[in-house]
UniProtKB/Swiss-Prot annotation:
Major location category of this protein: membrane
Protein name (record): ATP synthase gamma chain
Gene that this sequence comes from: atpG
GO biological process assignments: proton motive force-driven plasma membrane ATP synthesis
Organism taxonomic ancestry: Bacteria, Pseudomonadati, Pseudomonadota, Betaproteobacteria, Rhodocyclales
Biological role stated in the UniProt entry: Produces ATP from ADP in the presence of a proton gradient across the membrane. The gamma chain is believed to be important in regulating ATPase activity and the flow of protons through the CF(0) complex.
Homology family: Belongs to the ATPase gamma chain family.
One GO molecular-function entry: ATP binding
Amino acid sequence: MASGKEIRTKIKSVQNTRKITKAMEMVAASKMRKAQDRMRAARPYADKIRRLAANLSQANVTDYKHPFLVRKDQVKRVGLILVTTDKGLCGGLNTNVQRVAVNAMKEWEAAGATEIRACCIGNKGFGFMQRIGAKVVSHVTQLGDTPHLEKLIGPVKVMLDAFQNGELDAVYVAYTRFINTMKQEPQLEQLLPLTGEKLGTPDNSWDYLYEPDPQVVIDELLVRYVEALVYQAVAENMASEQSARMVAMKAASDNAKNVIGELQLVYNKTRQAAITKELSEIVGGAAAV
C-alpha cells in the first residue's frame, strides 16, 4: 500500500488537473455560444443565395449551362474537402469524420474512381490525410475561433477550378454537423455538381433582367454559393468542436472528482491503519512494562 505522503501527492496532482479541465470546460462553453451565433448568422445568407441560384438555374439564359450544374456520366476523378479541427481534446469528433471520409474514398475506388484529390481545412485532417498517403492539393490551418472566408477561398478555389476545368467529375465535403450541445454528426455531402435537391425549388416562374451579362452574373453567383456552402460547413464544424470539447472536459472534470474521492478514501484508510498500529505499539509497550 502506498504511503500517506504518496497518496497526498497524487490527490494534489489530480486536483491540479481538474482545475485545468474545469477552466477548459468554461472556456469551451463560452466559445460554443459564440460559434453557434456565427453558425446561425451564416444560414440566412446561404439560404438567400441558394434561392437566387435556384431561380437562375431555371431561368431562360439562352443555351448557357454553368459547369457547376453539369453532371458527368461517369465519376472517375473525385475531390474531397475534409473539414476538421486544428486542436484536439474534443472527444471523437475528428476520428468520426475521418472515418466517414476514408469509407467514402474506399467506396469511390470500388466504384471505379481513378483519382481522389483532397483539400484539408484544419490541422487534424491535414495530418491524417498525409499519414494515409492521400493526394492533398491544398490545405488551410490555424483558422482561429472565427473563420474568415478570405482564408478559405484560396484552398477551396483549387477544387472549384479543377472541377470547372474538367479535371474532377465530382466534389464532396466532409464535416461535422451541429445538432445540439450533446450531439454532433459527421456528414458527407456532394458539393459539385449542384443538384436540384441542393438548390431547391425556384421561388417563381418569372425571369430576371441581367446586367451587364447573364453569364457573368450566373458565374459569380454560383461560385459565391458554393463558397457559402463550405463556409457554413466550417461554421457548423466549429460549433460542434466547442460543444464536443465542453462535454469532454466536463467528463474529465467529473472523472477527476471521482478519482479524488477514491484517493481520499484510501488516504483515510492508510492514516487510520497507521494510527491503529501506533496505538497498538503504545499499548504493547505499556503492557510489557
